[in-house]
């Protein structure tokens, strides 16, 4: 593709050189540049790849996209924002693949992963070959791939969409992070349905204020309706029980469909009842009301199911098909996942890493707890410090016993992180055990029959980051090991 043809997709008045070389690939990593590449420079938090433009040119880059003039011997296209330009260029270069997909984007603080997995099951049941992009993994049909970020970088994203189309995928569900929205990674993505789960405190290390965080999430809905294909109706599926929804309603040109429990909505749940074996409720839609029994536990999971139901209905899936899927849902790895080693107490691993999600998980556990509730929780290093005392407060408020431990301390001193947490403790029903493995073994050793142990924060993760080192660590494996050890000692 010629350079002039490629950059014609940019509509923010780029400064385009007269030269018109052939572009054979797009790269954002100078180390991957080869003959014919278009190298896009981006200024990150720690590295500014404008500094590697000469290296890219020396490696054969045919042209460079930058935010400032660069002294190189190849054509330079000047743009206002290279992050967003990369997304649009990648979309165009790979044939605008999302135009060929029914694309569903899910954003919010909590519930994205579970909702996306439910939605994927619903679309499969409707006969679609599906793609899935999210926190746990990426799927193309029945193939599964590991991921580094909730939402990949713009280049990887468009390459993935193109691969999905090539493999016959016609419907894709993806989690859309606030970082991806703020950095413009999803510019060029033609969403058909955008889903909002909820907004609570998280990522303030990046966004600085809740107002900025709210704005970033809202970009998905503000951009929805600016369709590349005017024959496709666009839908914003919004949680009517969240106060932010009113603002998102005003910001979108798409058709709004609401769901909720406490506020009158298009799709609702009533008469919710929970046991340790599942949840029952009445699903109310504009068409009919249906009694639902599902294996998933918790009010938060009812919200996830409502979001997926509303998104499924606007995607043309019958209510009957949706109900059949809900009844068989087995849960998502690391989301209220029970670790069963034959013990007489319950061990649950959950990804809850925000105050709101931790509160929801602990409240749910207390609803069917016959004994004490233990909560093992930590907070990530190099991340939002303001939520540390709040997380600690939630743990002591809703658990009988709280154990503060390490999560992914990264470059921070684990003891300093825990000190931040202790400042939020309510009462004295907590203890501090820095080593996460030791903390899990300690709780499992102390638990009595019918107690519940919640191991929060890491969920599906199979690693722990200490300093710059990434160690294998899986809460589920450690818990199973501790359960087995205790059972063997009791024989």
From Swiss-Prot:
Motif (Meso-diaminopimelate recognition motif): 407-410
Domain of life: Bacteria
Keyword Membrane in annotation: no
N6-carboxylysine, modified sites: 217
Keywords: ATP-binding, Cell cycle, Cell division, Cell shape, Cell wall biogenesis/degradation, Cytoplasm, Ligase, Magnesium, Nucleotide-binding, Peptidoglycan synthesis
Stated name of the protein: UDP-N-acetylmuramoyl-L-alanyl-D-glutamate--2,6-diaminopimelate ligase
Catalytic activity, reaction form: UDP-N-acetyl-alpha-D-muramoyl-L-alanyl-D-glutamate + meso-2,6-diaminopimelate + ATP = UDP-N-acetyl-alpha-D-muramoyl-L-alanyl-gamma-D-glutamyl-meso-2,6-diaminopimelate + ADP + phosphate + H(+)
Any one GO CC term of the record: cytoplasm
Single GO molecular function: magnesium ion binding
Post-translational modification: Carboxylation is probably crucial for Mg(2+) binding and, consequently, for the gamma-phosphate positioning of ATP.
Disulfide bonds: none
EC code: 6.3.2.13
Species of the source: Bacillus anthracis
SUPFAM superfamilies the UniProt entry points to: MurD-like peptide ligases, catalytic domain, MurD-like peptide ligases, peptide-binding domain, MurE/MurF N-terminal domain
Amino acids binding meso-2,6-diaminopimelate: 383, 407-410, 457, 461
Cofactors that this protein relies on: Mg(2+)
Residues annotated as binding UDP-N-acetyl-alpha-D-muramoyl-L-alanyl-D-glutamate: 30, 149-151, 177, 185
Compartments, as annotated in UniProt: Cytoplasm
